[in-house]
UniProtKB/Swiss-Prot annotation:
Expressed by the venom gland. Its main location: secreted. The cysteine framework of the conopressin is C-C. It is found in: Secreted. The keyword Transmembrane does not apply. One of its GO terms (cellular component) is extracellular space. It comes from Conus monile (Necklace cone). Belongs to the vasopressin/oxytocin family. This is Conopressin/conophysin, isoform 3. One of its GO terms (molecular function) is toxin activity. InterPro entries: Neurhyp_horm, Neurhyp_horm_dom_sf, Neurohypophysial_hormone_CS. The modification Glycine amide is found at residue 10. Disulfide bonds join 2-7, 23-63, 26-37, 31-53, 38-43, 70-88, 82-100, 89-94.
């Protein structure tokens, strides 16, 4: 996964073809979106700590989120990662997901 502004020239589909780095860490886990921090205890969205994740947008190298892949039923964005027990997130949404349990 990559954040919105730091995707490679060809878009998100080209992330696997170029260099990536792990997304930055936040207060209790990993940044999974510009305003979302997830870890073992769940996810925070829009908090002061989670908003620090928007710094990832300044990096020219796309980042990848740890966790196995999961599919979301979300128009235009069906690929996500299991970011904590039972939660699948993409760059713009998180949802409860059985594949992440």
């Amino acid at each position: 996964a990559c954040f919105i502004r730091n995707c490679p020239k060809g878009g998100k589909r080209n992330v696997d073809e170029g260099p990536t780095k792990p997304c930055m860490f936040c207060s209790f886990g990993q940044c999974v979106a510009p305003h979302t921090c997830c870890g073992e205890k769940g996810c925070e969205m829009g908090t002061v700590d989670a908003n620090m994740c928007q710094e990832e947008n300044e990096s020219p190298i796309p980042c990848h989120v740890f966790g196995k892949r999961c599919l979301l039923n979300h128009p235009g964005n069906s690929h996500g990662n299991c970011v904590t027990y039972g939660i699948c997130c993409s760059h713009d949404t998180c949802t409860v997901h059985l594949a992440c349990m």
